[in-house]
């Protein structure tokens, strides 16, 4: 099975590029972040024509996550237990944002759940999936519990959004502990945009990030805690590169990037990984 993750930054804007990428890379399931649309606005028909069923979670034009699969899609969850809520402004009602989506792909995943967030594939259609950083478990016959995650940005170290980010990661850690305690042999993949650079070499110049989010000690400790909870980042030893380059200030041509997109896997998932890649070519487009 070929898994992948991609912060698509508007699925409606880039649907043609996404579908072309899926076909070219021949990947089975794609975790998408920043889809930036509600379920009824998602281009489901285009994915279905390519042979993918899609689970979608989006509340408005912000955030949004989705999973496209050609190997089955079942047990869809639009949040993880204990996922913190966020109030966009003072006095506003706090809501659980569209930042996490889980589904079982591969094996006997089946035809998905009975929800408008899932569209079954058309019979006989072919397809694939892929993106920024993804492992390749060897056997398509065994299911994987895949989560598409878009971790809060944090904004500034003194901003409430930063504390929200840390609380979000801590709640996720508790879920991982519980999931693996209930099923130690579960093939679990947490893929997405983590908005954290765990190591100094994951940014082009640490001096630029002095006193900023994404590289702070508490954020890095939060990701390290996932390892202690039983997860391994499965792409690190197989590929070295950045996964994100700001569109401003010619960051991409200068290779002034960050590595913030990762796939954290359980022991069962990590044992099946045979390779990984980061597709810089997709960043060359708009």
Task: Describe each region flagged by the PLM.
Residues 3-7, 22-40, 146, 176-200, ...:
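Active-site beta-strand/loop signature of hydrolases that rely on acidic residues for catalysis
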Residues 6-11, 88-90, 164-167, 211-212:
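Short, flexible loop segments at the rims of nucleotide/cofactor-binding pockets, characterized by
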Residues 11-13, 37-40, 157, 197-198, ...:
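Active-site environment of divalent metal-dependent phosphoester hydrolases
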Residues 12-23:
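Short, acidic/polar
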Residues 26, 51, 72, 184, ...:
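Residue-level detector of structured alpha->beta connecting loops
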Residues 36, 44-156:
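Structured beta-strand-rich core segments of catalytic domains in phosphoester-bond hydrolases
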Residues 41, 48, 76-79, 119, ...:
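Metal-dependent phosphoester-hydrolase catalytic domains
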Residues 162-184:
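A long, amphipathic alpha-helix that forms part
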């Amino acid at each position: 099975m070929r898994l992948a993750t991609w912060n698509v930054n508007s699925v409606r804007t880039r649907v043609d590029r996404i579908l072309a990428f899926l076909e070219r890379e021949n990947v089975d399931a794609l975790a998408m972040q920043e889809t930036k649309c509600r379920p009824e606005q998602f281009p489901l028909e285009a994915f279905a024509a390519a042979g993918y069923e899609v689970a979608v979670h989006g509340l408005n034009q912000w955030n949004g996550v989705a999973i496209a699969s050609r190997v089955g899609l079942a047990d869809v969850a639009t949040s993880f237990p204990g996922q913190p809520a966020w109030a966009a402004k003072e006095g506003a009602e706090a809501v659980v944002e569209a930042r996490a989506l889980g589904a079982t792909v591969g094996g006997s995943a089946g035809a998905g759940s009975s929800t408008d967030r899932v569209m079954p594939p058309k019979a006989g259609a072919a397809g694939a999936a892929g993106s920024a950083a993804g492992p390749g478990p060897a056997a398509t016959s065994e299911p994987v519990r895949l989560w598409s995650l878009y971790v809060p940005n944090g904004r500034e170290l003194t901003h409430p959004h930063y504390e929200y980010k840390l609380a979000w990661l801590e709640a996720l850690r508790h879920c991982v502990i519980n999931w693996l305690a209930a099923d130690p042999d579960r093939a679990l993949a947490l893929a997405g945009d983590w908005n954290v650079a765990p190591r100094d070499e994951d940014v082009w110049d640490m001096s630029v990030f002095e006193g900023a989010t994404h590289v702070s000690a508490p954020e890095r400790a939060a990701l390290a805690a996932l390892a202690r909870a039983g997860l391994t980042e499965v792409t690190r030893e197989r590929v070295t590169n950045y996964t994100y380059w700001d569109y401003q200030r010619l960051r991409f041509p200068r290779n002034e990037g960050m590595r913030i997109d990762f796939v954290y896997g359980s022991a069962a998932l990590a044992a099946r990984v045979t390779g990984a890649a980061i597709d810089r070519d997709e960043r060359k487009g708009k």
